[in-house]
Amino acid sequence: MLLMWYAAAMKQNVDYIFTHNFIDQNYYKGLTNKPTHILQSLLIEDPLKDLEIKTYDQRTNSAIIGGNFSQWYSGFDSYIVAREFSENVAAPSMGRSQHGEEQVVQKVPHIQWKDWMSHLNSFRYAVHMMRTAAAGTFSLNCAYLGIPCIGYSIIDTQSILHKEVTVQVGDIGRARQLACRLRDDREFYDHVSHQVQERYRRFYTEEIFLKKFYEVVSQ
């Protein structure tokens, strides 16, 4: 009943729908006749104006996974790929947690977002093999910092910003190959790092977000 109410409310009470991902756009287009637009996830840059983005040599030779070790975040997939970089794999503390995961990953405690970005800045590699279409803020944060993030193509921030290290859902083999190449090929790492920052500036800045938003609401 709740889902039926939700669908009816969308049809009656909204003028248009914003989604984060291409796959979401198709879903809502099929559910309702309302105009549906992709509006990218947003990173607020002002709190980070004093954050100095670290270089390759300033970062630890280790990986952090997006989400945590739970099934919801496909933590096992991320962990298997991240182990190609280092035996020590870090993961943020999340609302959904897996019993005993602290024995497998080094948990990052809940901290303010600005502190989180400073902490993320210390890692050389990132992995986020999430199978669910979500906002993609982890991949977005990594792109801002120039950290290559291996992940599945279902999330737009992953497939657009980190396209050289994006794989189809379930392709663990290809993801592990890319991890090994990032680890062993410095030229490839530098190329990906540069490209993700360049694409962030091209597609995901606050100015681009606002431009797209006002283009829709002013119609």
Question: What positions do the PLM features span?
Answer:
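Membrane-proximal helix-turn-helix segments that form the acceptor-binding/catalytic region
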Residues: 1-17, 30-31
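Carbohydrate-associated surface elements
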Residues: 23, 42
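Conserved catalytic-core segment of nucleotide-activated headgroup transferases in glycan assembly
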Residues: 44-113
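Short alpha-helical segment that forms part of, or immediately flanks, the ligand-binding pocket
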Residues: 117, 139-145, 158
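Conserved acidic donor-binding loop of glycosyltransferase catalytic domains
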Residues: 150-153, 159, 167
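Conserved acidic donor-binding segment of nucleotide-sugar-dependent glycosyltransferases
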Residues: 163-173, 181-186
